[in-house]
Amino acid sequence: MASVKVKFRSSTIEGKEGTIYYQIIQNRVIRQLKTDYRIFTDEWNEEENCIIVDRSERGNLLLSLQERMEWDLKRLDMIIRQLDNRKAGYTADDIVASFQSNTEGQSVFNFMQGIIARLKQMGKIRTAENYSCTLKSFMQFRGDRDVLLSEIDSDLMQLYEAYLHGKGAVRNTSSFYMRILRAVYNRALEKELMEQRNPFRHVYTGVDKTVKRAVPLSAIKRMKNLDLSLQPNLEFARDMFLFSFYTRGMSFIDMAHLKKKDLLNGFLSYRRRKTGQQLVIRWEKYMQEIVGKYPEDSLSPYLLPVLKYPFKDTHKHYRNVMSGINRNLKEIARLADISVPLSMYCARHSWASAAKGKNIPISVSSEGMGHDSEATTQIYLASLDNSVVDKANAQILRDL
């Protein structure tokens, strides 16, 4: 079986970036496959044959290059396995030619991975995760056999939808994957990589109404009054849910990344990671009660004890913590006699529901939650006075 090694060639000019390339060996014949991945010598780990991803200003770029490199290696492995399965001889040149033909012809796998890498480079980690999840599902459907963008048609999408439903996916789940694939397809159309074939016209791409996830104020009050002092994991989960509710339904990823410096002069200021919108919240006593409950770590820049220190796998750690919290919230729901399947996302819905119950205009509640889609939330003008939203929030918290 052929082998592939990652190599780095430093620049002959001091201070210039070097180039990463792949060394392919088959039957003792060596071929080189060039890439356009350029890094500095001190960004390459010679022993591990990988890029050193740090917290510098080039961190996102290096992470993107490392993941593109890992994807290339996966593609090369798939190509080699497919050639092996043919039970016919092949050369190192055949491997290189197959790799380059998919790249030049813009295969779906390769094109999507390029989008994922760019999303991560831009810091849009959650969106990149959604695209990665879709790519993984589509690759499983295809049995790791790549397909050109020009070969995407209605029949293929209908087969993929049937495959998803056969695996037990509900319509909203299959629609989630289809909408992402449609976005990928449209991006390829913009780049004029193929002609429009309307491949999604016979598959479902809508959103079915789901069970409401809002929790009434009376239930939140029961949750707040639970004595969980002997169950610290449940207490932490409850506190994170309440903090989200107190801060107008702040998303958990925004909570996790709050910095101590974001709280100043009685106001909490942060930028939504999903939309980039800047929000300012008046600091209330209930918020302080939660923050004050947990010992301050002088070495950590974060306001809440979700993330400890900035590190490479911050997002992975955040996801693990959120998973544990959501799991514990199910037990809290049982203890507080709450029938809704409780999760951190419920806090966001619950604040909006409470605002509606107080006859607070939707324009005010949508501003409070940081929505930016006029079609879904009728967002107020960006110049809306923050005091209006703070007053609405204080009105809700008084009932707890």
Regions flagged by a language model, labelled:
Residues 134-141, 147-151, 155-158, 166-199, ...:
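N-terminal DNA-binding recognition helix of tyrosine site-specific recombinases/integrases
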Residues 261-269, 338-340, 360-379:
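Short, polar N-cap/turn motifs at the start of nucleic acid-interacting alpha helices
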Residues 229-232, 297, 326-367:
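Short, basic (Lys/Arg/His-rich) helix/loop patches that form interaction surfaces
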Residues 272-276, 369-394:
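Catalytic-site neighborhood detector that most strongly recognizes the C-terminal catalytic loop/helix
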Residues 158-160, 194-225, 309-317:
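Flexible interdomain linker/hinge and immediately adjacent N-terminus
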Residues 220, 284-339:
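Active-site/catalytic core of tyrosine-dependent DNA strand-transfer enzymes
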Residues 25-29, 81-167:
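Basic/aromatic-enriched alpha-helical hairpins
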Residues 280-285, 289, 293-294, 382-400:
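DNA/chromatin major-groove-contacting recognition/catalytic segments
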